[in-house]
Amino acid sequence: MPRKGPAPKRQLMTDPVYGSPLVTALINKVLRDGKRSLAQSIVYNALEGAREKTGQDPLVILKRAIDNVKPTLEVRSRRVGGATYQVPVEVRASRSTTLALRWLVQYARLRREKTMTERLMNELVDASNGLGAAVKRREDTHKMAESNKAFAHYRW
């Protein structure tokens, strides 16, 4: 650990269209090879498509999707006397949001629709309705933490 203490948290800029740091974080997750304008068009078109598909405000859809995918528990490996245990630990709020965005984009990329815009739009709509692969990933993570509850006394 550095002597100066932990590095200060940087505030994300708000995006120009919605004025939300969550949308900026989503754009940063979609970003590949420094092509920010492409990532922005993918995210904005996906949010507009979600508005047309559901008739709801895109920011509400995004927020609900993130809330449905955020994990509250995860397992971390801990080595104790030659054995490695999967120890369940609580997830900090900032990490849970980061994981939710990561899983949404990861599972959107694995979908079978033709364009990334369609994939992201459908994954966001599914996640906001409590469906989709990203929500399943959260449930699997919670199930893993629940099944390893016996090792909770090893947490640090």
From Swiss-Prot:
Disulfide bonds: none annotated. GO terms for molecular function: rRNA binding; structural constituent of ribosome; tRNA binding. InterPro entries: Ribosomal_uS7, Ribosomal_uS7_bac/org-type, Ribosomal_uS7_CS, Ribosomal_uS7_dom, Ribosomal_uS7_dom_sf. GO terms for biological process: translation. PROSITE patterns: RIBOSOMAL_S7 (PS00052). Pfam families: Ribosomal_S7. The keyword Ribosomal protein applies. Keywords: Ribonucleoprotein, Ribosomal protein, RNA-binding, rRNA-binding, tRNA-binding. One of its GO terms (cellular component) is small ribosomal subunit. Belongs to the universal ribosomal protein uS7 family. Part of the 30S ribosomal subunit. Contacts proteins S9 and S11. One of the primary rRNA binding proteins, it binds directly to 16S rRNA where it nucleates assembly of the head domain of the 30S subunit. Is located at the subunit interface close to the decoding center, probably blocks exit of the E-site tRNA. This is Small ribosomal subunit protein uS7. The gene is rpsG.
